[in-house]
A protein has these predicted regions:
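Auxiliary Fe-S-binding modules of radical SAM enzymes
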Residues: 1-38, 43
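Canonical Radical SAM [4Fe-4S] cluster-binding loop centered on the CxxxCxxC motif
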Residues: 25-89
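Conserved AdoMet/S-adenosylmethionine-binding subsite of the radical SAM
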Residues: 91, 95, 103, 112-176
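Short linear motifs at secondary-structure transitions and domain/linker junctions
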Residues: 21-27, 78-81, 126-133
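A basic- and aromatic-enriched beta-loop-alpha substructure that forms the phosphate/nucleotide-
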Residues: 20, 24-29, 90, 97-104
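Short glycine-centered, acidic/aromatic-flanked micro-motifs in structured strand/loop junctions
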Residues: 108-109
């Protein structure tokens, strides 16, 4: 089971059985997918899988002195509305919403906190549909067993405002 943040697979219009969802995606359209808006693959039609949990707790001060936190705190450390799904069900949902989309973005939180399940998901997505897979990561964890199935890593290194829990602090400070 993968632990997903709320709206963990998005934007989709069909459920695991291929039936239309009662609620429209945030776009307001009965069209699955969106356009990757960042980085090298900017403009590529994509589906996203947002996993729950992060090994960091990013906060920072603005020039005006306001405290800000992670832009996806609901996926990182405020995971009250998270849920779990089996890898096979995620693959079915993706399959029913694929259309002409060939790109999957696995993001978080930090996906590599669930490395074994991410690896299993990537294996299934490659086996079933030959998707191009991007993983968006904070670059504090590297799991070699996953690397061979991932086509592109989108690294988002963190600054001194990221404060991981104690077990990860030494590694974080060395690799920052």
């Amino acid at each position: 089971m993968l632990h997903l943040a709320k709206d963990g697979i998005f934007p989709i219009t069909k459920d695991k059985d291929g039936k239309l969802l009662k609620e429209l995606p945030a776009s307001g359209l009965h069209v699955a997918g969106t356009i990757q808006g960042e980085g090298k693959l900017n403009g590529v039609p994509s589906l996203f899988i947002r996993l729950a949990g992060c090994n960091l707790h990013c906060t920072w001060k603005t020039l005006a002195g306001n405290t800000c936190e992670c832009d996806t705190a609901y996926a990182a450390f405020k995971v009250e509305n998270s849920f779990s799904l089996p890898v096979e069900e995620i693959v079915r949902i993706i399959g029913h919403n694929r259309g002409n989309i060939d790109h999957i973005v696995i993001t978080g939180g930090e996906p590599f906190l669930q490395a074994d399940k991410v690896r299993a998901l990537c294996l299934q997505l490659k086996k079933e549909s030959h998707f191009h897979i991007t993983v968006e990561t904070n670059a504090t964890l590297y799991v070699e067993e996953c690397a061979e199935m991932i086509d592109f890593f989108s690294l988002s290194p963190k600054l001194s405002g990221s404060v991981p829990p104690a077990p990860h602090m030494d590694h974080h400070n060395k690799t920052r």
